[in-house]
Amino acid sequence: VLERALARDAGLGWIGKHSCLINKDAGSWFFLGEIYTDLPLPVDAPASAHCGTCTRCIEVCPTGAIVAPYRVDARRCISYLTIELRESIPEALRPLMGNRI
């Protein structure tokens, strides 16, 4: 399920340069979930993007996983390293992660 695209199209936020959905009130620190229904619900307009020239997420990514706007190298992403990687975290990335586990 393309959760971010569905959430964007539903007006819940916009896709930031870090490739996560950003909600104007909640930021990007939340989980997405879906309920599929055939109920006739009102449709919200998609949210417009507000990143503009901001590159803060790229600048502060501790492991340099955001290699370009809208492009993430998952092999450097802390979420991948701590949840999905089935081997030891590469030694070069450990100091960059700090206590973010």
Predicted feature descriptions by range:
Residues 1-100:
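Non-ligating segments of multi-cofactor redox enzymes
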